[in-house]
């Protein structure tokens, strides 16, 4: 098949591109030979013929080409996009006999403008990716200002990379990507990496090579533009990067440069100058195109190949937006979706209404959404992904008070619409702030320049070092304040009659009691409201305000250790009391995390919202005995009914992510998108029919899921425990599970589900929508009037009469010629027919009025039908509270089922007994297992703290690697499991409630914070000493080892003494055996050690000593730490170990002599009454001294 090929990029003539880029003084007219495209609809043989037209070059000579294998697309449905990168192929030189090139003559450089394009059904499901396009609608070239009416659609063929395997290896260029972009790097840094690699590395994987010299990389025009060079680049206000107010999100593009561009190219540069830190997915017809530096990103990150032409250009079809944007967002990029918001006809009409310049004569395009990891919203083009973790956006506002700070915080999950606000005082270590980011780790941090103290900036650099950061204005008209935030919310969302009742409870609490309009902030929450304003500002900047704010659910954030001070009215969503687990404890005990953590061990949840609830339980275990007991009983009952448990887990397994589905359906039904004139309300989507299908299919999947959940009351109708009854039974049976039958019945009968799933259009049933029913009633009434009038006319003419005509010429009276003489002046002749049955057609004032009424009724019906899907989603969202209550019940059931599943897998399990009113805090553990360890190889341990026979503080000694740290972690994790209500792996467990767990485990410095190992230890210990209560559990591992022995011993002894006086449950491990001597008779302290068995201990050669670890907690102290055994296990040379042993013996002897001497001196003091006893003691000490060999 003969086919002319277009040399232009997107239909742009090569000469035009040369003209507009040649105006840049740095432009170099390098010739690029375009690669061959094939029609995606062409037959296989036709594609091979086109491929064969590209010759191979061998030793400078052309040779016949063999048919190339079918090209495998860079990213396909059955290959994970995030997998190994495909090697890119270079553009090969073409022969003189290549097909004749066709050059379109147009003023616009971007093709594929919107038109009357009707996609084929097969195309709609195509998710393949080309280097630019597969098939497009009529281009803007066809819709130029001279010819606004679209021409006949032509195909745009797909680029083929003719990298034949038979080509000599000497002519192949390996194109393996070597760029590693750190998550959190700015767009400019990433772009700089791309460009610098392009200039410096001839084997850079994304550079299209010059056909005259395969070893010379092409430098794209955008890489040579003067205003993009590092020493020239400025923001839109003309500020250089070293300016304190430099805005990295904008770019200064010279007006002279813009004026030399074509309308379409200028349109791209204008959008890019306002969003320089974004990758623009620029809609051109049916495709999203990436130009210039964005094309580099597409090639490097998405596996695209460059389109032919003089500037960098790549792209993909509209249907692949979700996949491509997800890949870039996950890699730390910001993606701006640019849509066409008018058709060529609309553009023509617009140009007629204004005095249009040449730059006005291009279809309008607008940014509809900017997406990064913290602003993900699941709209019609974005599917809900498999990740269940929330993606929080965090804003922090600080008031520096010298040695400490007051923080206002707002963190939100845009995918669900959860807004958390709070304000609190913090200590100099920022403990509460660290706990917040540990419990709710953000993916995006909003930062007001120069508004944070050094200690807070240090947290941002270290703890939040790997996440995205976005600046928010601190001054100027866009600066946020509490007053501005309340004013904006009042004007857009909560104004109107009864506005006091419109405000959410949390926001009402943050307003001044003296201002009934709600525009004055409470002094205690000014910082929190300012943080909320910063989040709203950024959401608005990303075009998400009407999508996120209307579904916002506000919750008060109170630091876990401050819950007791929370007002009941505003803390109603919080549990009465929780255990506090700070950032250090979460990390040291590995409570949360994807691998080898307590969360990953216990997580057998079937639903994503269940997984999120389990995460919340583990971060905030309950301190309410009644809550814990209810959970224990429910888990026990689930364990005793394994059949029902597996049935319910099978029921829950296929459930969608209902929480995100609710937010998505709310977005689909949100009329404020149109009311607030959001660009998405004007966007022209070529796959809109497919999106409508997907919307309805997803909606019906949600309805099916809720329908399936209505089986739960029947499945658990015989349950006995209080909690299971509450979360599975209907209100009439004493439960809290909502009765959804009425709502589900309505949506089941409102429309034909099968037809809607196939067509993407709702065919409503009577009673579904009042406005639709009213319109249909109006149509029915007009039809009755038409019938009545027709009967009257038949009586008048004395014959049978029918209506004739269609559309605007309907309802003409078709009167036989033989009776037409009875028509008087009130009848208007509209036409007549000849032949066997001649007739005349008349209209009257009555028929014209009936036609007008019918058209009005039909217009109303069509308007309702067009908006019917949105109204259906809106009705669903109106019952949000019921759906959410059902989700909460199911989430609790899922977590309980997960804990029951875990318990069923353990060899040993028990139900902990918790005591809330104990006189003395205690813990009794018998044969306990580490919950994350393999029980078959783990040695169980038991201990007692705070009982009648044992003191609350255990001074723990034992050999190196003997299991001291493991025991401490085991105790901490088992206590957490006990207080979330789980059954724990132990023979038995009894304890009083723990209000907080403190840990000081491991040895590590903090280089980024400038903290040494010892300073880190002391900071963590200081926190313990300040905040521990008698109900806390303290786990301290080898405190003092980071400094000199005597300093460390003294600090450790002082801390032990403090904790012993506090009488909190403590495990204090140490290798300082002087502490044992100091506290060995102290009744406040219990001595314990990790048992071991030693062979050849008295041997003079330490390398012959063998230590067998028994990993068993035993009463009493361990005489030494057996460090030489650890050295032997580590493979140290035996000579070094022996020499160390000799030195150790000498040091021990010196220390012992000093100790004995001190006792002799003490023994000689005193009066005559004790002289005899002291003389005897002195004789014993002298004997010991003689035994010391130095």
From Swiss-Prot:
Tell me the Pfam families matching this sequence: MutS_I, MutS_II, MutS_III, MutS_IV, MutS_V
- Gene Ontology biological process: DNA repair; meiotic mismatch repair; mismatch repair
Where composition is biased (Acidic residues), the residues are 109-126
Q: Where is the composition biased (Basic and acidic residues)?
A: 38-49, 56-65
Q: Where is the composition biased (Low complexity)?
A: 159-168
Question: Which cysteines are cross-linked by disulfides?
Answer: none
Q: Where Phosphothreonine occurs, residue numbers? A: 7, 12, 14, 16, 33
Q: Which GO terms describe its molecular function?
A: ATP binding; ATP hydrolysis activity; ATP-dependent DNA damage sensor activity; mismatched DNA binding
Q: Could you tell me which residues carry Phosphoserine?
A: 8, 22, 24, 95, 97
Would the keyword Protein transport turn up in this protein's UniProt record?
no
Protein family per UniProt:
Belongs to the DNA mismatch repair MutS family.
Describe the function of this protein.
Involved in post-replicative DNA-mismatch repair.
Q: How does this chain assemble?
A: Heterodimer of Msh2/Spel and Msh6.
Instruction: Kindly provide the name given to this protein in its UniProt entry.
Output: Probable DNA mismatch repair protein Msh6
Species name for this entry? Drosophila melanogaster (Fruit fly)
Lineage in the entry?
Eukaryota, Metazoa, Ecdysozoa, Arthropoda, Hexapoda
Question: Which gene name belongs to this protein?
Answer: Msh6
């Amino acid at each position: 098949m003969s086919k002319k090929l277009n040399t232009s990029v997107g239909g742009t003539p090569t000469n035009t591109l040369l003209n507009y880029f040649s105006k840049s003084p740095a432009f170099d007219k390098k010739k690029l030979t375009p690669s061959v495209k094939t029609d995606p609809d062409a037959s296989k043989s036709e594609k091979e013929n086109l491929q064969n037209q590209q010759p191979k070059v061998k030793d400078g000579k052309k040779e016949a080409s063999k048919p190339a294998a079918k090209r495998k697309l860079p990213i396909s449905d059955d290959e994970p996009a995030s997998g190994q990168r495909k090697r890119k192929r270079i553009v090969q030189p073409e022969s003189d006999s290549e097909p004749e090139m066709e050059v379109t003559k147009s003023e616009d450089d971007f093709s594929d403008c919107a038109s009357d394009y009707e996609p084929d059904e097969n195309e709609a499901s195509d998710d393949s990716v080309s280097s630019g396009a597969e098939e497009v609608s009529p281009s803007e070239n066809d819709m130029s200002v001279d010819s606004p009416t679209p021409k006949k659609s032509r195909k745009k063929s797909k680029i083929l990379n003719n990298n034949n395997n038979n080509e000599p290896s000497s002519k192949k260029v390996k194109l393996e990507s070597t760029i590693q972009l750190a998550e959190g790097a700015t767009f400019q840094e990433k772009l700089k990496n791309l460009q610098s690699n392009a200039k410096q590395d001839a084997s850079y994987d994304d550079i299209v090579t010059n056909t005259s010299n395969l070893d010379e990389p092409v430098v794209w025009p955008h890489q040579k533009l003067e205003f993009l060079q590092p020493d020239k680049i400025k923001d839109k206000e003309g500020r250089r990067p070293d300016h304190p107010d430099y805005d990295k999100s904008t770019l200064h593009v010279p007006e002279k440069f813009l004026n030399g561009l074509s309308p379409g190219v200028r349109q791209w540069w204008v959008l890019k100058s306002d969003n320089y830190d974004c990758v623009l997915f620029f809609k051109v017809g049916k495709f999203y195109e990436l130009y210039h530096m964005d094309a580099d990103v597409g090639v490097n990150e998405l596996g695209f190949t460059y389109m032919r032409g003089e500037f960098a250009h790549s792209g993909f079809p509209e249907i692949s937006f979700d996949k491509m944007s997800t890949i870039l967002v996950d890699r730390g990029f910001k993606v701006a979706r640019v849509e066409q918001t008018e058709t060529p006809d609309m553009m023509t009409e617009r140009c007629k209404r204004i005095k249009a310049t040449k730059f006005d004569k291009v279809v309008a395009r607008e940014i509809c959404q900017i997406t990064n990891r913290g602003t993900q919203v699941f709209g019609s083009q974005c599917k809900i992904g498999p990740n269940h973790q929330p993606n929080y956006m965090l804003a922090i506002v600080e008031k520096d008070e010298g040695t400490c700070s007051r923080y206002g915080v707002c963190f939100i999950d845009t995918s669900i619409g959860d807004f958390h606000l709070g304000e609190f005082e913090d200590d100099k270590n920022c403990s509460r702030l660290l706990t917040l980011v540990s419990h709710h780790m953000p993916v995006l941090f909003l930062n007001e320049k120069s508004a944070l103290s050094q200690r807070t900036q240090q947290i941002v650099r270290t703890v939040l070092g790997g996440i995205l950061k976005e600046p928010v204005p601190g001054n100027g008209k866009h600066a946020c304040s509490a007053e501005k935030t309340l004013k904006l919310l009042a004007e857009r969302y909560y104004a109107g009659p009864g506005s006091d009742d419109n405000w959410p409870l949390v926001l009402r609490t943050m307003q001044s009691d003296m201002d009934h309009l709600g525009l004055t902030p409470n002094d205690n929450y000014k910082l929190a409201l300012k943080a909320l304003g910063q989040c709203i500002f950024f959401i608005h900047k990303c075009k998400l305000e009407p999508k996120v704010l209307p579904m916002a659910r506000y919750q008060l954030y109170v630091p876990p250790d401050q819950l007791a001070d929370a007002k009941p009215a505003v803390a109603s969503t919080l549990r009465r009391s929780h255990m506090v687990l700070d950032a250090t404890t979460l990390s040291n005990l590995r409570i949360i995390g994807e691998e080898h953590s307590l969360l990953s061990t216990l997580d057998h949840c079937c639903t994503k919202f269940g997984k999120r609830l389990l995460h919340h339980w583990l971060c905030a275990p309950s301190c309410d005995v009644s809550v814990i007991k209810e959970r224990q009983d429910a888990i026990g009952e689930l364990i005793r009914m394994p059949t029902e448990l597996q049935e319910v887990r099978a029921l829950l397994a296929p459930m969608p992510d209902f929480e995100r589905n609710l937010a998505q359906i709310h977005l689909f039904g949100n009329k404020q998108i149109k009311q607030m004139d959001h660009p998405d309300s004007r966007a022209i989507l070529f796959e809109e029919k497919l999106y409508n299908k997907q919307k309805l299919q997803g909606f019906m999947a949600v309805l099916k899921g809720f329908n399936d959940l209505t089986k739960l009351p029947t499945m658990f109708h015989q349950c006995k425990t209080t909690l299971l009854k509450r979360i599975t039974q209907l209100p009439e049976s004493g439960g809290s599970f909502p009765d959804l039958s009425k709502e589900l019945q309505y949506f089941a009968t409102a429309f034909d589900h099968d037809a809607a799933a196939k067509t993407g259009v709702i065919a409503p049933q009577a009673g579904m929508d009042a406005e639709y029913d009213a319109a249909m009633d109006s149509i029915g009434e007009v039809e009755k009037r038409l019938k009545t009038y027709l009967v009257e006319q038949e009586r008048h003419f004395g014959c049978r009469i029918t209506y004739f005509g269609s559309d605007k010429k309907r309802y003409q009276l078709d009167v036989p010629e033989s009776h037409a003489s009875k028509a008087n002046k009130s009848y208007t002749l509209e036409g007549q027919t000849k032949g066997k049955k001649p007739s005349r057609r008349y209209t009257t004032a009555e028929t014209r009025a009936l036609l007008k009424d019918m058209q009005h009724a039909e217009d109303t019906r069509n308007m309702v039908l067009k908006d019917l899907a949105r109204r259906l989603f809106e009705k669903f969202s109106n019952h949000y509270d019921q759906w959410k209550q059902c989700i909460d019940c199911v989430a609790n059931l899922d977590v309980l089922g997960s804990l029951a599943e875990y318990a069923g897998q353990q060899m040993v399990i028990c139900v902990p007994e918790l005591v809330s009113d104990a006189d003395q805090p205690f813990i009794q553990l018998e044969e306990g297992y580490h919950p994350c360890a393999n029980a078959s190889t783990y040695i169980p341990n038991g201990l007692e703290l705070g009982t009648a026979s044992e003191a609350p503080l255990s001074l723990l000694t034992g050999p190196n690697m003997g299991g001291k740290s493991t025991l401490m972690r085991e105790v901490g994790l088992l206590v957490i499991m006990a207080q979330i209500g789980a059954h724990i792996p132990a023979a038995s467990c009894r304890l009083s409630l723990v209000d907080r767990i403190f840990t000081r485990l491991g040895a590590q410095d903090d280089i980024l914070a400038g903290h040494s190992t010892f300073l880190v230890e002391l900071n963590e210990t200081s926190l313990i000493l300040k905040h521990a209560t008698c109900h806390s559990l303290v786990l301290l591992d080898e405190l003092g080892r980071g400094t000199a022995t005597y300093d460390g011993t003294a600090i450790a002894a002082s801390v032990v003494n403090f904790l012993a006086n506090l009488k909190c449950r403590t495990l204090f491990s140490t290798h300082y055996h002087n502490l044992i001597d100091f506290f060995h008779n102290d009744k406040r302290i219990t001595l314990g050690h990790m048992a071991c068995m030693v062979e050849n201990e008295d041997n003079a050669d330490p390398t012959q000593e063998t230590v067998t670890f028994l990993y068993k907690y035993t009463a009493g102290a361990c005489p030494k730490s057996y460090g030489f055994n650890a050295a032997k296990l580590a493979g140290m040379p035996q000579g070094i170990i022996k020499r160390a042993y000799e030195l150790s013996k000498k040091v021990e002897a010196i220390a012992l002599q000093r100790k004995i001497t001190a006792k002799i001196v003490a023994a000689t003091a005193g009066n005559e009454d004790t002289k005899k006893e002291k003389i005897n003691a002195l004789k014993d000490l002298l004997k010991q001294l003689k035994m010391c060999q130095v």
